Amino acid sequence: MASVPTRIEGPVAVIGDVHGQTSQLREIIAQLAKLPDIHRRWIVFIGDLVDRGPDPAGAVQLFCDLVKQHEKVTWLCGNHELAMAGTLGLIDAPDYIDFRGRWTNHY
């Protein structure tokens, strides 16, 4: 298992609340790639890649692709990821975050 950094040094880009908006996420990643310090820049996703938008699976795939291309990427789970994990039975979750019907019908 890879160690999880507890301290980040150097430049940081923070991305949050993507909500399945893959075209916007692609544009953000393309803009970051143009930065002269990208090789040492951390890219931190602060949650909510999924839910609401048109392509939550695509947003997760873009994140996974970025992890393969750039060694300084991390993702903090947001409430929507926790709700999804609870709905899938991966974690215990309170009833109020059960989006099973909504996700099954929408996605």
Predicted segment positions?
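Active-site neighborhood of divalent metal-dependent phosphoester bond hydrolases
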Residues: 39, 52-107
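N-terminal active-site segment of His-dependent metallophosphoesterases
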Residues: 1-62
